[in-house]
Amino acid sequence: MISLMLSSSSPFRSSPFSHASSAALDRLPRATKLTTELASVSPWFEERKGRIAKVFDKKEVGISTYDTAWVAMVPSPLMISSGEPLPCFPDSLLWLLENQCHDGSWAQPHHHSLLNKDVLSSTLACILALNKWGLGDQHIAKGLHFLEMNFDSAMDPSQITPIGFDIVFPTMLDHARSLSLIPTLDQTMLKELMNMRDLELKRCSSSPDMEAYLAYVGEGQDRERVMKYQRKNGSLFNSPSTTAAAYIASPNSECLKYLNLVVNKFGGAVPAVYPLDIYSQLHTVDDLERLGISRYFVTEIESVLDQTYRCWVQGDEEIFLDASTCALAFRLLRINGYNVSSDPVTHCVVGHMNKDVNTALEVYKASQLTLYPHETQLEKLNSSLGALLQDQISSASIQSTQLHAEVQQALDYPFYAILQRMANRKAIEHYNFDPTRILKTSYCLPNSGNKDFLLLSVEDFNRLQAMHQEEYKEFERWFVENRLDELEVARQKVEYGYFTAAATISGPELSDARMSWAKNCVMISVMDDFFDIRGSVQEMEKIVELVELWDVDISRECCSNDVSIIFSALKQTISEVGDKGSKLQGRNITPHIIALWLDLLYSYMKEVEWSGSCSNPSFDEYMSNASVSFGLGPIVVSTLYVVGPHLSLDMINHSQYHNLFTLTSTCCRLLHEIRSDERELKQGKPNALPLYIAENGSMSKEAAISEMITMSNTLRKQILTIVLDNNSVFPKPCKQIFWNMLVANQLFYRKDDGFWSKELLKVAHQIVHQPILL
């Protein structure tokens, strides 16, 4: 019998108040309600919220020198009398002439020092554009000098390589050489670049998965390959440069229509991607949710998601023809309860994603949201992309520190195995101020790297933490007042109990829910240790008897000191949450909580009986009892009654409630059994893993673990399906409590018994005690 959250061997340091004297106890401050007066609010808090709300109306897109250069190369369909073409977009040419840097390059302002390959590519494209129309001889000369002085960057492995650079840049160099523009470049390096280009083309041409990639980076080299990817708006991949190159190679009225649209919208300089509205808006929503401040922008977020869902239903190409947008839309829509199919995500081409880590990461996170048995392709995508991203980590090929951390987190902590506040803190700590993204060229993602996002999230995190710290003091006072510090096995339970509460139920208005969760966690751990290790059979039976009688004067009962302490603390805890829950629900809910505790105690006694008789139950018989002895009922249901929504008797008796209860209990128990079999066998206790092996003949332990993990994964998907169903009778905040419990156990048992993890000890301290400092 092991408790849901707490282990008898937990390595947490003892509570600082475990042995507090009565005098010290009296000096402890009483916690105050901070729902209306959290820690002091900075005068800029509301101002930042207002500025963030306005970003949903912003649709600014950063300009791209590279794309502008290709647009500037486009000839006009009109011919002068001599038959020579004119530039179709003279404003783009003018922009090139007016925006060369002093060093001769056409770098973006304040470009990153690792983006020299991008600068080389953009500068060469500008040179070719000006040369095509016989303009800017001095600009061209300065640009060529820059290329000569910085050409070695093209082969520098420490530099960030834009998508397709190994094809695009050598191809432009070839064209420049044919025009006798670059006679002084290092010929050995030039030859090496050409060889790399040829090898890359050969490698990609042999893979059907790379066809779209070649069309994107081919810059009009293969009309048949490129034009099959033309979209309804006339573009190729929503890329002005790819579309311009395709038009130059073979004029097409739809391509020209798209280019006219982009130039008319943005003026001479064009962006690297257009349109980008859906992805930009979704990225903003994702940032706010990851940083833990989405509750301040519910209306704006709902508007974005509703509009995205309409576009999804209508089959909008901006979603379905871009892997990043499709994956992000799918993930945010599904996790927010919209009914969306995973089929579009599974059509994302994996072949070229090793060249675009951002896209690979986006699709990988989406692929974690498998719900249904038929979504096998989504699971395969998850497996293949997980391996790809792990290779990127192992080979140290991700040069961005923030992106490396984000990929590592996604691999280590899938969304179903990381607590809310834990994820929020990691997102804050890894927040990337640099809005630069890399495709064929660099561009700035609108609203990415927004300083207000970070400042608001840090202040909000610390304000909530200040409230949690006050609650924690009250929690420790409860621990000491109920003499739980006198039970040696219970001394290390306080922090884990409150950590899981604060990390999953963090809202300022949910103090009662946090305290109910945390106190019941500790009580179950105390009871679990007592039935496992400390208590005699007579003492166990006495505890059961006292809970059955309930209204007893413990001072008149003949029982041990341990039994007296445990029953008194349990009665006080149940009575407290019962009173609060009864007031909120408008009916007496205490008998239900007592009944849940009795079910738990009866299941404990069944395990004591099995251990004492040395008899082994069947796997199914064991799991039926073990799902109860795991202790989910008292923690979760007590919390349900004080988390907010009204829970009628019809809801509590509804099959959906019982189904969710059983699924979650069983899934959590399976996770525990897989990671604790050796310890429990040493204690002479039955465990599901050896029982499962015994019932399946010669099955190896590894095979049994694999099958039990598959069982737990299936249960997790069923649970999430219920939680995300917006049409269910059970209130969403209540379903979320079940999900929080599952996530906590997924975290603790994702690799081994997490109660031994120094990493989780550190996380618990960070969430409850350590403010974020900028």
From Swiss-Prot:
Source organism superkingdom: Eukaryota
Record keyword Membrane present: no
Residues annotated to bind Mg(2+) 3: 672, 676, 680
Location in the cell: Plastid, Chloroplast
Cofactor stoichiometry and binding remark: Binds 3 Mg(2+) or Mn(2+) ions per subunit.
GO molecular function, one term: terpene synthase activity
InterPro entries, per database record: Isoprenoid_synthase_dom_sf (IPR008949), Terpene_synth_N (IPR001906), Terpene_synth_N_sf (IPR036965), Terpene_synthase-like (IPR050148), Terpene_synthase_metal-bd (IPR005630), Terpenoid_cyclase/PrenylTrfase (IPR008930)
Keywords of this entry: Chloroplast, Hydrolase, Lyase, Magnesium, Manganese, Metal-binding, Plastid, Transit peptide
GO cellular component: chloroplast
Location, primary (coarse class): plastid
Cofactor: Mg(2+); Mn(2+)
Chain sites annotated for binding Mg(2+) 2: 528, 532
Motif DDXXD motif positions after renumbering to this chain: 528-532
Binding site for Mg(2+) 1: 528, 532
Pathway note: Secondary metabolite biosynthesis; terpenoid biosynthesis
Presequence extent in this chain: 1-30
GO biological process, one term: gibberellin biosynthetic process
The family this protein is said to belong to: Belongs to the terpene synthase family.
Record remark on domains: The Asp-Asp-Xaa-Xaa-Asp/Glu (DDXXD/E) motif is important for the catalytic activity, presumably through binding to Mg(2+).
Name the UniProt record assigns to this protein: Diterpene synthase 3, chloroplastic
Organism (species): Salvia sclarea (Clary sage)
